[in-house]
Structure formats: C-alpha cells, structure tokens
Regions:
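N-terminal, polar/Ser/Thr-rich
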Residues: 7, 15-17, 21-80
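Beta-strand-rich interaction surfaces with strong enrichment in secreted/lumenal proteins
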Residues: 68-71, 85, 130-132, 144-149, ...
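Extended, low-hydrophobicity, Ser/Thr/Pro/Gly-biased non-transmembrane segments
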Residues: 160-250
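A surface-exposed beta-strand-loop module
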Residues: 39, 108-180, 246
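Solvent-exposed beta-hairpin/edge-strand motifs
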Residues: 46, 95-128, 187, 225-230
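Asparagine-centered strand-capping/turn motif at beta-strand->loop junctions
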Residues: 87-92
C-alpha cells in the first residue's frame, strides 16, 4: 500500500467499554460446538496488576487480559483483529456464557460501516470450537463456554474479528483529506467484556451523544500493523517498532 504527499495520523484509543444484560429472546445462534471430543487443557499465562488512582484510593486488581493483533486496511476502510481474551470469573455465580460489547457494529448501514464479522471462535485451552450468540442489539454478542466457569476460575477464548470503519468525523470513523489520503480515528474499536453485577451481565443501549460506555479495567497487549506512511498515536507504552515490506508494526 502506497500513500504519498502527506503524513497521515491514526488515533487508536482503546477505551474499555462494556455493558450487558442478556435476554433469551430474539437471539441468533451460529453453533459450531463439538462436545464429543475431550482435550487436555493448556495452562494460561495471565497477567494480574494492582493499581491505585491515588494514595488515598482503594487498590483495584486488574485481571482480565486482551491480546490483540490488529491490522488496518486503509484501502477498504476496515481492520482485522486476532483477539484472545483471558477472563476471570470475579463473581459468586457460575457462568455458562460470557458477554461482549461490539460498538463498531452500531454503524451498520452500507455507507457508514457494517456489522462486524466474527469467525474462528474457540477455547484456547482445549481448542474446542465455541458457540457465538448474536443479540437483537447488534452491539452485543455472547459466547457459550465449553464448560461452566466457576467463581475465581480462569478461561481463555480467541476469535478473528473484522470491522468496517464509517466515514465520520468522530472518535470512531475516518476522514478523507488532501490527495485522497485518510485519517482514521479508532476509539472503542475492540470488542470488550461486559461487567457482571447483581447476578447478570450489564449493558445499556448505545447512543451517539455523551458517554454510554461502562466496563472494568483490563490489561491490553496490542500489536498494530499499519502502512509505513502512517503515524500511530495511541495510549499505552510503545515497546517495539518493526518495518516489514510496506508496513509498520508497533
């Protein structure tokens, strides 16, 4: 991919946004489970961090981890992510499903994006295929676990995710600038876990103005692949930059 005459900016702001109460009505299921085969579980290397807002605030333990390999397709205004999520059941209840918020799917008309695509959904410990359940709200989906997740237990799931960026001057969108070059703004671009509170997963309807996002903090390890002619501006610590052909990997 070649882009000339201007240095373009991508803003990747990974906001931790979540919300989920799931009802069993109006759900569409893509079932690809195989319960007949048993696998030996692979141990999960999970990172746990304890933080404080200030010296007077209580400590908060961050246990959920996202490992994302993000590739931006500037020609087709979309991106692909291979995403692994390590999830700890921090409640007193047993979970048979876990729920995600998928905000990019809010832009579902043909000119301003599409509903995202999720494939290759599986349990990373056993390599068992998992069931994807679509909610009536396109920004919500759930994953049926291979086995019940008891309190304090850890599981890890992985899937391939493709999302389409709308033509919008907003925190999630792209703008065409001089010489048909583009700026991409990619806030809330990764699916995130919904908090579990009061006996259920919490989510609220998406609305365009204001803040409707609710989630818990998590650890993010993100690898971003962009054209060399682009500059990445993002939160977090930049650990390494690699050049491969016409791409820049950070």
């Amino acid at each position: 991919m070649k882009h000339k005459n201007i240095k373009l900016i991508i803003t990747l702001l990974i906001f931790i946004i979540t919300i989920s109460i799931i009802f069993n009505t109006n759900k569409k299921s893509s079932k690809i489970t195989d319960s007949s085969t048993k696998f030996e579980k692979i141990p999960i290397a999970n990172k746990t961090v304890t933080v404080q807002w200030n010296e007077n605030s209580p400590e908060v333990t961050i246990q959920n981890n996202y490992i994302a390999n993000f590739i931006l397709d500037v020609d087709n205004n979309c991106y692909n992510i291979n995403l692994t999520v390590n999830v700890i059941n921090d409640s007193n209840d047993t979970w048979n499903e876990i729920y995600f918020r998928d905000y990019p799917s809010a832009f579902s008309d043909k000119e301003n994006g599409k509903v995202s695509e999720i494939t290759n959904l599986h349990d990373t410990q056993t390599n068992t295929s998992l069931e994807l359940i679509k909610n009536e709200d396109p920004t919500v989906f759930s994953v049926k676990l291979a086995s019940p997740l008891l309190p304090t237990e850890l599981t890890s799931i992985s899937f391939d995710y493709k999302a389409y960026v709308p033509n919008l001057n907003a925190r999630y969108g792209y703008q065409t600038i001089n010489n048909n070059s583009k700026d991409f703004y990619l806030a809330n671009c990764i699916p995130i876990l919904c908090p579990y509170e009061n006996g259920k997963f919490q989510y609220y309807p998406y609305f365009a103005v204001g803040e409707c996002f609710y989630s818990k903090m998590a650890n993010y390890d993100v690898t971003v692949t962009i054209p060399k002619s682009y500059t990445l501006i993002a939160t977090g610590d930049n650990t390494e930059i690699t050049n491969i052909n016409d791409n820049l990997i950070k």
